Amino acid sequence: MQKILVVDDDKDLLEMVEMTLSRLGYHITTLAKGSGFFNVVESIRPDIILLDIFLGDADGRILCNKMKLQSAYENIPVILYSAGYVPLSTIEHSKADEFMIKPFEIKQLTEKVKKLLGLQ
């Protein structure tokens, strides 16, 4: 079973994504803040990460960039997303594999997840 880490401070979105992706057969781990991100990545070794940019206590772009600089985690695909304006250059610098604007259609999210996991 493939593992997905979802990091977002919006509890409603976390629940929706967890419920939807669980039904598709993925094992979901959720995190409601940026602190603890690296500990969770190390402990569960997710196959893909869905990461909000504007977390209450962290910037998802920075978390993504720091993770991708570590050889043990550089190949984990990351989908960054945000409801606010984000300059494209900062997304590119983060080394994220995909970017989405909230609100997004859950079908669009599942298609991107499947694509990055090589299932499509």
Model-inferred region functions:
Residues 62, 84-101, 107-111:
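Alpha4 helix (beta4-alpha4-beta5 surface) of REC/receiver domains from two-component response regulators
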Residues 25-33, 40:
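Short hydrophobic/Thr-rich beta-strand motif most characteristic of the beta2 strand and flanking loop
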Residues 33, 59-62:
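Acidic catalytic/metal-coordinating carboxylates
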Residues 61-72:
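Short amphipathic alpha-helix used as the core "switch/output" element in two-component signaling
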